[in-house]
Amino acid sequence: MFSTLLAVFIGGGVGSVARWQLGVKFNNLYPTLPLGTLLANLIGAFVIGGALAFFLRHPHLDQDWKILITTGLCGGLTTFSTFSAEVIMFLQSGQLAAAGLHVLLNLAGSLLMTALAFALVTWVTTH
């Protein structure tokens, strides 16, 4: 149990610091697109897609490694709450196009990145 908590703690800490840094470096570049949030979600989606494919092909790996990457790292890196708050702020300020673009890029982009990474890792590990 302690090793699992430690895995979540370490992965979550690394992911959260990475998300914070992405926000600091990129969120102010485009006023109508919080790029740091988008990058955090797209990178996290790619990592979890690749991890899912990898772990499916390596079921013998210790569960704590899976939890460190998925629940910890990806959970700390990605941010549905910040994304949701940004959409609401766009809507409150009447920026409907920015809100719609943010929703489209984050949701569709994250799904595409997850699928892309899953397919890529599957292809690499079977060839």
From Swiss-Prot:
Tell me which InterPro entries the record gives. Answer: FluC
Q: Under the GO molecular function aspect, what terms does this record hold?
A: fluoride channel activity; metal ion binding
Which residues are noted in the entry as Na(+)-binding? G75, T78
Q: Tell me which GO cellular component terms the UniProt record holds.
A: plasma membrane
Biological process annotations from GO: cellular detoxification of fluoride
Q: Where are the transmembrane segments?
A: 4-24, 35-55, 71-91, 103-123
Any idea where this protein resides?
Cell inner membrane
UniProt keyword Protease, yes or no? no
Query: What controls its activity?
Result: Na(+) is not transported, but it plays an essential structural role and its presence is essential for fluoride channel function.
A Pfam family this chain is assigned to: CRCB
Topological type in the membrane:
Multi-pass membrane protein
Highest taxon of the lineage: Bacteria
Provide the catalytic activity annotation: fluoride(in) = fluoride(out)
Listed A to Z, the keywords are:
Cell inner membrane, Cell membrane, Ion channel, Ion transport, Membrane, Metal-binding, Sodium, Transmembrane, Transmembrane helix, Transport
Spell out the family assignment given in the record's similarity comment: Belongs to the fluoride channel Fluc/FEX (TC 1.A.43) family.
Known role: Fluoride-specific ion channel. Important for reducing fluoride concentration in the cell, thus reducing its toxicity.
Q: Per its record, how is this protein called by name? A: Fluoride-specific ion channel FluC
Which organism is this entry from? Pectobacterium carotovorum subsp. carotovorum (strain PC1)
